[in-house]
């Protein structure tokens, strides 16, 4: 994506958007926001000792956030937690992970090690045994709706699904989540830096960008604290203020400020991920599944689609497109069953049309992200367009 960056602030000054954000809040929210800024400013100066939990679970006292074994009742507002690892896999149940999955359960997490440790059969079992559901990125908010032992049952907002109106459901180890009201206030109200310039980028411990702290995925969004000409200082859930290379992110005051893309914009960015590994449930630059890939590419460009392929096909944002009229950025769907374009229930795969009779896709556990010829075989279900002006 080209452009869309907020004007740079003089070195050492906060971007004016922070002041506007505070001014636009109500009294109570404004107090929380200012307190959050003081909290993180103090952390930057080193006047805070302790108080943050880098590796611990998201708890507020004995028994965790909700007490041992409790679930949310009808009408209750679930408490928030924040992802404290570069990418947290959302599992189907606490019993789903196998011994080979341990690198994906720790803090810090080792997604690349996990992928390299799995045999092809173990990769395929993630799909066939329905072991995992999706992923959430560093700093993302999740809602905790229950818990079991060392696990929190969550829903992930920003990943729409018919399964739950609040977000995508599943389970995350408590060790990968944290709570921090100051961070939550900034997440809600401050301008944010969006990682949108490559597969992954790094957080740094200082503005000189020489001391790497944590590798994070494309589509990660973190609240902005300040800027220099070369770096953006951001708040993190449990690591204190960190810095991002300004060349790898765009800064926006609110999500609706992200420029609306063309189909060519989507395809250019999708092509960056060619040869990234396939990972069932993957939705990060470390590995994608088919619908995690398409939904992430669109979301980086300010458009939120449902998480799963069948729900993407059914989404009201999409308009049917004849195969003779495909444009870059259109999504192509494949089904083992009915080819009725009004019935997406049997859809098993989605790809993005990239032009010239080709598409880009995260196909299966033996195939990394690739550009290949469009398949218009018996499994082709139809296409949907989500842009008003796809070119």
Residue ranges and their predicted role:
Residues 26-40:
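Hydrophobic membrane-insertion alpha-helices, especially the h-region
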Residues 67, 186-188, 199-201, 205-210, ...:
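Aromatic- and glycine-rich peptidoglycan recognition patches
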Residues 277-292, 296-328:
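Catalytic cysteine-centered active-site loop
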């Amino acid at each position: 994506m080209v452009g869309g960056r907020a004007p740079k602030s003089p070195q050492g000054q906060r971007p004016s958007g922070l002041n506007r954000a505070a001014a636009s809040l109500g009294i109570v929210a404004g107090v929380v926001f200012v307190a959050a800024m003081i909290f993180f400013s103090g952390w930057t100066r080193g006047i805070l000792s302790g108080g943050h939990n880098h590796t611990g679970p998201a708890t507020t006292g004995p028994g965790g956030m909700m007490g041992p074994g409790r679930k949310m009742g009808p009408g209750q507002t679930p408490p928030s937690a924040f992802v404290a690892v570069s990418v947290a896999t959302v599992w189907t149940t606490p019993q789903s992970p196998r011994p080979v999955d341990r690198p994906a359960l720790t803090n810090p997490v080792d997604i690349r090690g996990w992928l390299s440790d799995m045999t092809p059969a173990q990769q395929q079992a993630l799909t066939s045994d329905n072991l995992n559901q999706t992923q959430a990125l560093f700093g993302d908010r999740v809602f905790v709706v229950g818990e079991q032992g060392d696990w929190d049952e969550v829903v992930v907002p920003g990943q729409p699904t018919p399964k739950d109106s609040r977000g995508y459901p599943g389970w995350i180890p408590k060790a990968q989540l944290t709570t921090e009201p100051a961070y939550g206030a900034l997440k809600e109200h401050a301008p944010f830096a969006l990682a949108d310039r490559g597969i992954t980028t790094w957080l740094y411990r200082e503005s000189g960008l020489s001391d790497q702290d944590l590798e994070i995925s494309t589509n990660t969004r973190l609240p902005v604290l300040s800027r220099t000409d070369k770096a953006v200082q951001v708040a993190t859930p449990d690591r204190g203020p960190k810095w991002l290379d300004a060349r790898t992110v765009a800064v926006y005051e609110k999500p609706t400020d992200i420029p609306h893309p063309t189909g060519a914009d989507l395809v250019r960015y999708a092509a960056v991920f060619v040869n990234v590994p396939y990972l069932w449930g993957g939705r990060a630059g470390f590995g994608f599944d088919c619908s995690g890939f398409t939904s992430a590419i669109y979301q980086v460009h300010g458009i939120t689609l449902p998480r799963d392929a069948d729900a993407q096909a059914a989404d009201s944002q999409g308009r049917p497109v004849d195969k003779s009229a495909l444009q870059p950025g259109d999504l192509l769907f494949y089904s083992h069953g009915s080819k009725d374009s009004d019935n997406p229930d049997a859809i098993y795969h989605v790809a993005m049309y990239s032009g010239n009779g080709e598409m880009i896709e995260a196909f299966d556990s033996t195939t990394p992200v690739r550009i290949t010829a469009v398949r218009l075989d018996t499994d082709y279900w139809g296409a949907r367009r989500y842009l008003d002006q796809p070119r």
